[in-house]
Amino acid sequence: MSGHKKILIVIASVIVLVTGLTLYFQYQSHQEYLQLKTSFEERDNIVVLQRLMASEKYAPDIRKAGYVVPPDGAIRLDGGIDSIEIKGDIDLKISHSGRNGVTAYFEIEIDGKITSALYELDKNFDITSSAYFQINEKNINERVNISQSEEERLLKIVQSEIDGFMKKMYQTLYG
């Protein structure tokens, strides 16, 4: 075989390999896109949040929708988006806490004191556990209780904010 034929075979092999890899990665990206859309449409909230927060891939879209996420460098360092800030009736931070839930953190004023609230929510964004903390006069963070009606009122606000986020993200991604 002549030298030109060997070179042409090598070049053709490289072109086929590069084209194959490019098509494979485009296919994978399209599959992820369709899986996320299906999860949105099936209201599989935990899977949607998991996919949105798994890497920096959707960070620009989340920012475009008007939400706050860490800088890209921090996302790469952490291996994903650790929290999303939703500014609305309450300033809410949500994070994906595992396979079965979402953590929601926010601060509100109760009886003239700033109260930190932490909710663990299930796939329907119902509370599985909640905790409320205030800083006392000795500057110590202590757990406090709130009434059931107040917790229900706050939960409705949190659910509304997260539902709004989900709808806005669907609109941003799929128009």
Residue ranges and their predicted role:
Residues I9, Y27-Q31, S160:
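Basic, mixed-charge low-complexity alpha-helical segments
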Residues A74, G80-G175:
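Extracytoplasmic electrostatic interaction patches
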Residues I7-F25:
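Hydrophobic membrane-insertion alpha-helices, especially the h-region
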Residues M1-H4:
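Short, Lys/Arg-rich N-terminal segment immediately upstream of the first membrane anchor
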Residues G20-E107:
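N-terminal export/targeting and maturation segments
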